[in-house]
């Protein structure tokens, strides 16, 4: 036997390969002609068609598709070069390979100078300190235990709503701190204040003395209910406090070594909180967009992901596990329904297409008519309330006073309650896919809720600037009805926020809890069982708090303490919604993923911020500021404080600022920004194409196993057939 083996080495080696097919040498004489076996794989052939592009990318970011045998070369080459700048934890390697990298790193440290070793050690210590600090801050998060409990019982979709509510609490607290540090704190620190120091900026001949009059309600015999009205509407004793714009009729605050410019600080605080909100929301939105971009998939991959990776392992409650099971089943049925509708759309005839588009056009006209009717009702309610508030408010009783003061808020709340029901009925006849139905309904409700605030503000603006006599024309605004129009706009925002808060509490206490009791203890009634238990609808609740946050953004300029009120309001709403969720509500069967929810929430919030910036910009740049109250009494508009401040700078700095803000600089800068934007758009398109190619490569690699098994089977047959042929 030994002779046979020695005399026929090829035969012996072939027999060994037959016993151990994984040790087959695919480049041996068994295969004629000898070729590299890996080059026959479907995935390798796909790579070969675009070898040039992949090689160019490999030089920049490392080879994506490499055999495991070349790993040692990769360790000795590209990765070891980056050990100085990147942590070993970032590499997708096993423990033994990471240990080898660590040994290489420690070996390299011995040959460095003391200065380089100290820099490496300092950088590593600083990174370790930052990681420990991040771990510590996670334990200091607001409502961390409550949100974890909600996540465990109801899943990540509802947990994302409460995390979003926590974000708004922190955001409003930061906004309040900005306003407090820039506006309130300097006033509280000193008793010396300067008033009307720059009155000469507005010549007396261009302004009537009536413009500077601000009649304050006389303090006589006041009924107790008047204090309740003042507390709910911001009038009376609250109107003269630091809650509203009219309290800050100060040009500056005098300290020992300098004078604090309060008008400039007031405007800068407004710009600062808007810019901070924008940057913070965009930053969080980009993170959510990245997750959505990574999870974007084709339809056939969606089914696999839902079946094999769709379970939420944070769920610890049995009933919630059953709900998640039904939710996954619902999502699969919805995907199949969308696929059926997609196939139905592809099979439509031209007559059916014309009929459907005609029906959609008609239904969208109805939607526009409903929106127009709501906006007109808000306009009429606001105009009626403003006209009768000053004339007949003293002659009315308690109930009539509240009705007049809160009439715009009541109409807006009714519109926000009725229109979603109408939109939900209309959308069923438009023949859209289920997913698009939800998105379009939410989009319409978002537009309705946020546009009502803008209609209210623009209605107030039209009433403020409508002039009917010479005094009004001299002042630039309707001084008779609005001697301090900024304060009255702040009062409207204050009333909207208070009324929205009252409605949320009333619905929870007087609708949700009684409904839960009826469903629990009146199970025999079919009508009550059909009514059912209240669902925790995530989109509706999100729209409610975004509506409140938009009010806060608009009203913070006219009522500087409104962010503090919003912070307290959202804190109470958190606990109220948590109790409502735990004891009165059941989650909606249409659940949201946490990543999709966070991105959707922030997108709606960003729309609200953009809509809030528009009326604020118009009020600061176009409408004349009040001459009887506020820090801008000596300026025609709020924005004029900026050029007035720039005029006090040195001439060289003024020249630089004027050059930067001129058209000669703006046009080239805009062109450069457009070029940069086009570059990033092209880069994003290239990256998208690479992602498509890599997905194709991934799907082709799934066929490699079948191909390898087929080749190994052929090799075994060929090896076994060699002795018989010999």
From Swiss-Prot:
The chain crosses the membrane at residues 167-187, 218-238, 262-282, 361-381, 403-423, 493-513, 554-574, 599-619, 664-684. Glycans are attached at residues 23, 94, 636. The keyword Transmembrane applies. It comes from Mus musculus. Acts as an inhibitory modulator of Piezo2 mechanosensitive channel in dorsal root ganglion (DRG) neurons through physical interactions or interference with the interaction between PIEZO2 and the cytoskeleton. It is a multi-pass membrane protein. Interacts with PIEZO2; the interaction inhibits PIEZO2-conducted mechanically activated currents. It comes from the Eukaryota. The modification Phosphoserine is found at residue 87. Its main location: membrane. GO terms for molecular function: ion channel inhibitor activity. Residues 188-217, 283-360, 424-492, 575-598, 685-726 are cytoplasmic. Belongs to the TMC family. The lineage of its organism: Eukaryota, Metazoa, Chordata, Craniata, Vertebrata. GO terms for cellular component: plasma membrane. Ubiquitously expressed. Expressed in dorsal root ganglion (DRG) neurons and satellite glial cells. The keyword Transcription does not apply. It is found in: Membrane. PANTHER family: TRANSMEMBRANE CHANNEL-LIKE PROTEIN 7, TRANSMEMBRANE CHANNEL-RELATED. One of its GO terms (biological process) is sensory perception of mechanical stimulus. Keywords: Glycoprotein, Membrane, Phosphoprotein, Transmembrane, Transmembrane helix. This is Transmembrane channel-like protein 7. Disruption phenotype: Conditional knockout mice in nociceptive neurons display increased sensitivity to mechanical stimuli and comparable sensitivity with heat stimulus. Also display increased chronic mechanical allodynia in DRG neurons. Also display increased proportion of PIEZO2-conducted rapidly adapting current in DRG neurons. Residues 1-166, 239-261, 382-402, 514-553, 620-663 are extracellular.
């Amino acid at each position: 036997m030994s002779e046979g083996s020695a005399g026929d080495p090829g035969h012996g080696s072939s027999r060994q390969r037959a016993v151990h097919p994984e040790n087959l040498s695919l480049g041996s004489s068994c295969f004629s002609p000898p070729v590299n076996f890996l080059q026959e794989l479907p995935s390798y052939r796909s790579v070969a068609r675009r070898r040039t592009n992949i090689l160019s990318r490999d030089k920049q970011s490392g080879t994506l598709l490499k055999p495991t045998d070349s790993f040692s070369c990769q360790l000795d080459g590209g990765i070891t070069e980056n050990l100085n700048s990147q942590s070993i934890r970032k590499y997708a390697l096993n423990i033994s390979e990471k240990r080898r990298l660590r040994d290489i790193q420690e070996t390299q440290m011995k040959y460095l100078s003391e200065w380089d070793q100290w820099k490496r050690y300092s950088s590593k210590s600083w990174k370790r300190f930052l990681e420990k600090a991040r771990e510590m801050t996670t334990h200091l998060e607001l409502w961390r235990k409550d949100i974890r409990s909600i996540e465990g019982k109801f899943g990540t979709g509802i947990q994302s709503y409460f995390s979003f509510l926590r974000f708004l609490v922190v955001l409003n607290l930061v906004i309040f701190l900005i306003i407090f540090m820039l506006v309130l704190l300097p006033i509280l620190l000193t008793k010396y204040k300067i008033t009307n120091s720059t009155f000469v900026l507005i010549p007396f001949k261009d302004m009537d003395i009536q413009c500077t009059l601000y009649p304050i309600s006389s303090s006589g015999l006041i009924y107790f209910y008047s204090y309740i009205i003042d507390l709910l509407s911001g009038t009376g004793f609250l109107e003269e406090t630091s809650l509203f714009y009219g309290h800050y009729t100060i040009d500056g605050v005098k300290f020992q070594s300098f004078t604090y410019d309060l008008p400039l600080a007031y405007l800068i605080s407004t710009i600062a909180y808007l810019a901070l909100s924008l940057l913070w929301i965009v930053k969080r939105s980009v993170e959510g967009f990245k997750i959505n971009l990574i999870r974007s998939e084709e339809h056939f991959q969606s089914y696999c992901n839902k079946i094999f990776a769709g379970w939420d392992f944070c769920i610890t409650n049995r009933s919630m596990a059953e709900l998640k099971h039904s939710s996954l089943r619902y999502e699969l049925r919805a995907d199949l329904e969308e696929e059926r509708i997609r196939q139905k759309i592809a099979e439509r005839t031209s007559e059916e297409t014309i009929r459907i588009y005609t029906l959609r056009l008609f239904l969208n006209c109805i939607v526009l008519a409903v929106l127009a009717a709501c906006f007109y009702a808000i306009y009429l309610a606001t105009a009626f309330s403003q006209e009768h508030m000053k004339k007949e408010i003293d002659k009315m009783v308690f109930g009539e006073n509240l009705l007049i003061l809160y009439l715009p808020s009541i109409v807006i709340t009714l519109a926000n309650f009725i229109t979603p029901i109408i939109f939900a009925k209309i959308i069923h006849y438009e023949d859209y896919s289920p997913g698009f139905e939800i998105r379009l309904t939410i989009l319409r409700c978002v537009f309705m809720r946020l546009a009502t605030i803008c209609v209210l503000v623009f209605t107030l603006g039209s009433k403020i600037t409508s002039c009917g006599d010479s005094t009004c024309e001299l002042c630039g605004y309707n001084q008779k009805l609005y001697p301090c129009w900024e304060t009255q706009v702040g009062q409207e925002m204050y009333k909207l926020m208070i009324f929205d808060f009252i409605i949320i509490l009333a619905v929870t206490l007087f609708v949700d809890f009684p409904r839960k009791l009826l469903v629990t203890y009146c199970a025999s009634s079919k009508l009550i069982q059909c009514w059912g238990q209240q669902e925790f609808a995530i989109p509706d609740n999100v729209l409610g708090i975004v509506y409140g946050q938009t009010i806060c953004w608009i009203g913070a300029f006219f009522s500087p303490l409104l962010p503090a009120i919003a912070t307290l309001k959202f804190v109470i709403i958190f606990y109220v919604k948590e109790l409502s969720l735990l004891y009165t509500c059941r989650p909606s069967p249409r659940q949201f993923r946490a990543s999709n929810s966070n991105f959707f929430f922030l997108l709606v919030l960003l729309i609200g911020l953009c809509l809030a910036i528009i009326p604020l910009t118009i009020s600061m740049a176009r409408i004349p500021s009040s001459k009887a109250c506020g820090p801008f009494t000596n300026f025609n508009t709020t924005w004029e404080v900026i050029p007035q401040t720039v005029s006090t700078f040195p001439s060289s700095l003024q020249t630089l600022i004027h050059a930067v803000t001129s058209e000669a600089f703006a046009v080239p800068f805009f062109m450069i920004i457009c070029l940069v934007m086009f570059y990033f758009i092209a880069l994003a398109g290239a990256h998208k194409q690479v992602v498509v190619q890599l997905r194709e490569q991934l799907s082709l690699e799934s066929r490699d196993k079948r191909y390898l098994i087929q080749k190994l089977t052929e090799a075994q047959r060929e090896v076994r057939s060699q002795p018989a042929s010999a």
